[in-house]
Amino acid sequence: MYGIEYTTILTXLISLIFITYILKSITRTMDFIIYRFLFVIVVLAPFVKTQNYGINLPITGSMDTPYMNSTMSETFLTSTLCLYYPHEAATQIADDKWKDTLSQLFLTKGWSTGSVYFKEYTDIASFSVDPQLYCDYNIVLMKYDGNSQLDMSELADLILNEWLCNPMDITLYYYQQTDEANKWISMGNSCTIKVCPLNTQTLGIGCLTTDPTTFEEVASAEKLVITDVVDGVNHKLDVTTATCTIRNCKKLGPRENVAVIQVGGSNILDITADPTTAPQTERMMRINWKKWWQVFYTIVDYVNQIVQVMSKRSRSLNSAAFYYRI
């Protein structure tokens, strides 16, 4: 009986020693592989140029989408520039090769061929409905029109700032603006906005909540409306939802990779005169109106000075990411 017990103990000890030896062998083998792999990486690293391709993750609910796709810092050699211009510019120039000509001229200022993109829009109103600013630097040309000053100033406020927005269900809820940065932004083919301020008993102040015809009209048949009401007061809203979408937005701060250039007009539209807008006149500029060729020549000549007052950002404006927030 004792012999059997001794044999069992001896077998267990031998098994334990054997397992320990195997584990040590595996450990030595893994160490050899890991160290050899790290050695190869260290040797090859100086000869390999890598680039970080970030994942395109839209911030749904914000009009801003992150784009990170650069490990270089040279401003012009690796940056993209978008130039937005009205349709009338191409019509007046009437030259199929005019973009190629400008690309060659931008090359003399350090902007490589293929880094400058020309984006055409029909008019200020249509551009307001779906502005998309994708480049590292974005310059928007707006031809001055005395009848469109409000549209121009609201568009400038929209694209020169970053906004975080949520959808609004005006059929079920009342809404209030909490502070100066809180605005309601409406976009669509035709936006008519009416509001009815409410007292603490949710009764209309100067209006009937059940009768939209008694509401106060703050915008009529516009494509872009930035509505500002009295902070801290609930409001019942009436909006032409069939042709317009309204959102509750918070101004996050300046969008520093965008500049607006007013073409013509006796004075520049100063959106900083609006008490809801922080001073940012450096990125709101004006050039004299002559002919569109002259306008573009001026832009090319001063493009680097214009870019100097901007900041390259990793955010682009896309109204498609503007609708919902997770």
From Swiss-Prot:
Cellular localisation: Virion; Host endoplasmic reticulum lumen
Keywords recorded for this protein, A-Z: Calcium, Capsid protein, Disulfide bond, Glycoprotein, Host endoplasmic reticulum, Host-virus interaction, Metal-binding, Outer capsid protein, Signal, T=13 icosahedral capsid protein, Virion
Coiled-coil intervals, chain numbering: none
Chain spans, region LVD motif: 237-239
GO terms assigned for molecular function: metal ion binding
Region ranges (CNP motif): 165-167
Subunit (UniProt): Homotrimer; disulfide-linked. 2 Ca(2+) ions bound at each subunit interface in the trimer hold the trimer together. Interacts with the intermediate capsid protein VP6. Interacts with the outer capsid protein VP5*.
Protein's name in the database: Outer capsid glycoprotein VP7
Organism: Rotavirus A (strain RVA/Pig/Mexico/YM/1983/G11P9[7])
